Amino acid sequence: MTKYKYSVKNLKENQAKALARDASVSFKSAIEACNFLRGRTTKQALSLLEKVLDKKIAIPFKRFTDGVGHRRGNGIAAGRYPQKLSDVLIKLIKNAEANASIKALNENLKIVHLSAQKASVPMHYGRHPRREMKRSHIELIVEEIEEKKKEPKKKKSDVKSTTTTKTKTKSENQKKRESYS
């Protein structure tokens, strides 16, 4: 049996990770969901996945679209509502949040790395040798979002204007127009 390792080698101190090995979910839908959630905060991702479970928001399928029907939504051509995958991803995100709290990180977490790899396909016993059991590994790395400190705004008197504007009166503009004609 081969040993599984994270694809990200060097983990920063403000990052936490979680892994779902041999999850019984489709590899193709896992890739699409990872692309949909990457770059979002964990709170946003959890709320989106809850809406997917309620079938209010579809996960857009952009790469594996063969036979996938059109879904209603902004910018979604094809999409699905993967229920098992949503459950696995919710558990994985909560696991990463727990790992982050153990490392004493605050609750503002952003999903930096979320990827799916194809797992081994076990032999399916029985009379149907063509039936495959779909499994995949899903890894997640979250990073703490540092709050930006607000600087006090500078007053207009402190800022020096580099350009000078010249305003013309109506009479100057009229004289100029008359000289052209």
Outline where the language-model segments fall.
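Low-complexity, rRNA-contacting terminal tracts
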Residues: 1-25, 98, 102-181
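Ribosome large-subunit tunnel/peptidyl-transferase-proximal elements
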Residues: 2-108, 141-144
